[in-house]
């Protein structure tokens, strides 16, 4: 393979053989509503979220790991992949490997494959994300040994028990990073009567987000609009507060992990008890 693409709900990563990861950009596109002209893609488009006039639409063309807007996804991929192709040392049309969530349907898989082909690929190989994550973590997936991979992305969490080069048991759930952001927004609105945006929630999540109690309770200042007075307001939240905010999403992910373990062969579960979870 010449190029590897991780087509995520939140970010697109493009790897070029011999060069490493050359693109790591948000899966966000901004375009004019009337003309459909693309204004910005990636980081530039993400900075526009919540700040555009009515004439401009900012979208995430992938929702919960699935292509929701085929045309915009294709145009976004063309920009990223063609930029990556300029960094290649080889010539000719590239062979491209693209990752998809383990739970996608054949129709969804075909949509991704077709979109990548239209960027100019010679051939396209579609790989499930848990297998790619395991390989990236230096796990020998061909070994006759059970390894569990939990890949928490932006739109989906992919869970798989891997052995002999394949996923023996797997599940993809629509609970992941974006849900933690939404939980943060709801929690701050409910507790502090403060309305914050998606980007503010994500920054707070990265800064102090936690799913277990920390020895040192770090803090972060969140700014938004007071829902009672309608004026700008700043509050301070703690890491331990986010445990409560994230409880539902965390519980959903843990339940799915338990479910995959319960249906996996006992011998592989025994291996996982020794190897742990990647």
Annotated model-derived regions:
Residues 1-152, 160-278:
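Nucleotide/phosphate-binding catalytic cleft detector across ATP-hydrolyzing
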């Amino acid at each position: 393979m010449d190029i590897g693409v991780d087509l995520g709900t939140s970010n697109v990563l493009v790897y070029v053989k011999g060069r490493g990861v050359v693109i790591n950009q948000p899966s966000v596109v901004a375009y004019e509503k009337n003309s459909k002209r693309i204004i910005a893609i990636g980081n530039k488009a993400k900075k526009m979220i919540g700040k555009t006039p009515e004439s401009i639409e900012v979208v995430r063309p992938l929702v919960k790991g699935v292509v929701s807007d085929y045309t915009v996804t294709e145009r976004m991929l063309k920009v990223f992949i063609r930029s990556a192709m300029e960094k290649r040392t080889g010539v000719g049309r590239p062979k491209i490997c693209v990752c998809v969530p383990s739970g996608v349907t054949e129709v969804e898989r075909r949509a991704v494959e077709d979109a990548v082909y239209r960027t100019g690929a010679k051939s396209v190989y579609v790989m499930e994300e848990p297998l790619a994550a395991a390989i990236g973590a230096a796990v020998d997936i061909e070994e006759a040994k059970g390894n569990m991979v939990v890949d928490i992305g932006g739109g989906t969490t992919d869970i798989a028990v891997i052995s002999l080069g394949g996923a023996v048991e797997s599940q993809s759930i629509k609970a992941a990073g974006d849900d933690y952001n939404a939980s943060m927004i709801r929690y701050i609105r409910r507790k502090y009567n403060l309305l914050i945006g998606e980007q503010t929630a994500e920054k707070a999540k990265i800064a102090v987000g936690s799913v277990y109690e920390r020895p040192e309770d770090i803090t972060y200042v969140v700014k938004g609009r007071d829902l009672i007075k309608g004026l700008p307001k700043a509050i301070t939240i703690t890491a331990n507060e986010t445990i409560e905010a994230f409880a539902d999403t965390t519980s959903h992910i843990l339940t799915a992990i338990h479910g995959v373990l319960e249906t996996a062969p006992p011998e592989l579960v025994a291996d996982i008890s020794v190897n742990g979870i990647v």
